Regions:
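Acidic/histidine-rich helix-loop elements
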Residues: 35, 39-55, 94-109, 137, ...
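Charged, glycine-enriched surface loops/patches
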Residues: 146-169, 186-202
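N-terminal secretory targeting modules
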Residues: 1-78, 83-91, 159, 246-254
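Short, glycine/acidic-enriched loop or turn micro-motifs at the edges of active sites
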Residues: 83, 105, 209
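Loop/turn elements at helix/coil->beta-strand transitions in domains of secreted/extracellular proteins
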Residues: 72-74, 95-97, 122-126, 161-165, ...
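Oxyanion-hole/transition-state-stabilizing segment in secreted/luminal serine hydrolases
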Residues: 83-100, 108-147, 151, 156, ...
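Extracytoplasmic/secreted proteins, especially bacterial periplasmic and envelope-associated proteins
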Residues: 73, 77, 106, 110, ...
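Catalytic His-Asp segment of secreted/periplasmic serine-dependent ester chemistry enzymes
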Residues: 12, 24, 173-254
């Protein structure tokens, strides 16, 4: 009997190692609710304790529960509100089966927590990852900790699917007014570039320099709130991804 994907995702208990630690964290079988104790999340750096995250998290998982079986073997876009807000994703890649797994407010530690149920259980054809701005802005995390968490995400994906392409997008520019100063984002992106360079089947997408102004900040005509891109921004992101998809041989859905 074929077990539905959602059932598998919600009943699977996995162990993830704390990044840089010795203890292993047993991820609860049901990750559809944000943990009451965010400090229990895997990974390094401060945990996200923004009060609104639990509601967004639960809402997104309720939506995905309805489409879990349909979302297999697609290109999974994984991230935070910037990914969640990509409403034209399917239209922008009409020849690909795209699956949006963005959660507003999420961080690298949250992605590590939900990676198996939200992504790996879907047998993805490829993964596009953009994550880290909330680690810097909401949590004041050290860029090296964020980079280590991203490295662990890449590792976890390739432990399950060793040959699928992973496209890691640089953290987009924002502003010090949003607690996301250019120097910290640039430092994080340098570390991301270094890690991607040494990871097989992993590709870097420049989503910083294509947007940043002369000060390294987000231009208001593309990021109206200095954090989230508008339609022009998503179009530029699409254009940056297309040649990478071709290089990685991420093929159109037949």
């Amino acid at each position: 009997m074929k077990i539905p994907a959602l059932f598998r995702a919600l009943t699977l208990t996995i162990g993830l190692a704390f990044v840089g630690g010795n203890a292993a964290l047993a991820i609860p079988a049901d990750i559809s609710h944000y943990p009451a104790d965010p400090d229990s999340l895997p990974g390094k750096g401060p945990a996200n304790k923004w009060g609104g995250l639990a509601g967004v998290w639960a809402q997104r998982h309720a939506e995905w529960a309805k489409t879990a079986d349909q979302d297999h073997n697609g290109v999974v876009f994984l991230g935070d509100s910037i990914t969640q807000g990509w409403k034209s994703l399917g239209q922008d890649f009409p020849n690909l089966k795209t699956v949006n797994r963005g959660i507003g407010g999420d961080t690298t530690r949250g992605v590590l927590y939900r990676l198996d149920a939200d992504v790996l259980s879907l047998d993805p054809k490829a993964v596009v990852l953009l994550i880290g701005t909330n680690d810097i802005g909401n949590n004041g995390a050290d860029p090296s900790d964020v980079a280590d968490n991203i490295k662990e995400i890449i590792k976890e994906i390739h432990q399950r699917y060793s040959h699928i392409p992973i496209v890691v997008c640089e953290v987009m520019p924002s502003t010090e007014k949003k607690q996301r100063p250019a120097d910290k984002i640039e430092e994080l992106n340098k570390l991301i570039k270094k890690d991607v360079r040494w990871s097989s089947h992993t590709y870097l997408c420049d989503t910083w320099s294509i947007f940043a102004d002369a000060n390294g900040d987000a231009p208001k005509d593309i990021f109206p709130d200095l954090l989230h891109p508008n339609a022009t921004g998503y179009a530029k992101w699409t254009a940056a991804l297309n040649p990478i998809f071709a290089k990685a041989k991420i093929q159109p859905t037949e």
